[in-house]
């Protein structure tokens, strides 16, 4: 069996040396060459579009796939995990579902575009949870609205995981950047984030693009950030 680790932020993130991009994941899966695969997960989520791509790549894989949640599967990592043939969760692991979130700037029309994008993403994500658990869509989206955290036993009871493993307990850890988007994070995650190896630069530290005048030639496109992915509102994607 081929082992693949997703032990950091999903997406190619400068603030997390353990981050895993969709390209990284696809390369490792290709190297497995049809062999059974176990994806070991300890991730607070990240870039929703990388997670979607990773999920589709895993779903299309020809060999048998297992997702082993060993510390944390939160946000984008939670619905990515559900695309495996079997989802196994460690006895001390946590599972979390919530709504996608964004940082946006611009005019009123830009805010409406950002909100519309979030609504669409929320719908596609909730569909993944419904498919796995068999719960009603309204029930799933109510759980997402509340940012709901599940113990391993609760995750199995609600249908997010198929069974608990008998592995040794593993501490859940999440990057401080991912932690910013959590409203109801357990206390232990705060402590884990405090031990991060890097200081996270605030969004305000980014420098403007050269020649970016107010609405003039060379002006930077308006962007929104969805779970770590910066998108041009015209449809492009940038980090």
Enumerate the predicted regions with their spans.
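N-terminal organellar transit peptides
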Residues: 1-76, 83-239
């Amino acid at each position: 069996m081929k082992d693949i680790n997703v032990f950091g932020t999903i997406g190619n993130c400068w603030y997390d040396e353990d981050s895993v991009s969709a390209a990284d994941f696809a390369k490792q899966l290709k190297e497995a060459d049809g062999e059974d695969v176990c994806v070991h997960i300890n991730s607070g989520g990240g870039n929703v579009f990388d997670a979607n791509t990773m999920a589709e790549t895993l779903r299309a894989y020809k060999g048998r796939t297992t997702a082993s949640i060993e510390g944390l599967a939160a946000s984008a990592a939670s619905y990515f995990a559900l695309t495996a043939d079997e989802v196994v969760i460690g006895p001390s692991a946590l599972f979390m579902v919530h709504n996608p979130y964004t940082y946006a700037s611009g005019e009123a029309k830009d805010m409406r575009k950002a909100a519309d994008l979030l609504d669409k993403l929320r719908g596609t994500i909730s569909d993944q949870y419904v498919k796995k658990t068999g719960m009603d869509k309204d029930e799933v989206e109510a759980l997402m609205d509340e940012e709901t955290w599940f113990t391993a036993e609760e995750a199995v009871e609600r249908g997010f995981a198929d069974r608990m493993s008998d592995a040794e307990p593993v501490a859940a850890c999440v990057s401080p950047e991912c932690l910013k988007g959590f409203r109801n994070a357990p206390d232990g995650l705060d402590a884990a984030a405090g031990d991060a190896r890097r200081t996270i630069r605030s969004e305000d530290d980014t420098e403007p693009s050269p020649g970016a005048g107010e609405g003039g030639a060379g002006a930077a496109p308006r962007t929104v950030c969805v779970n770590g992915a910066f998108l041009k509102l015209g449809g492009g994607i940038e980090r």
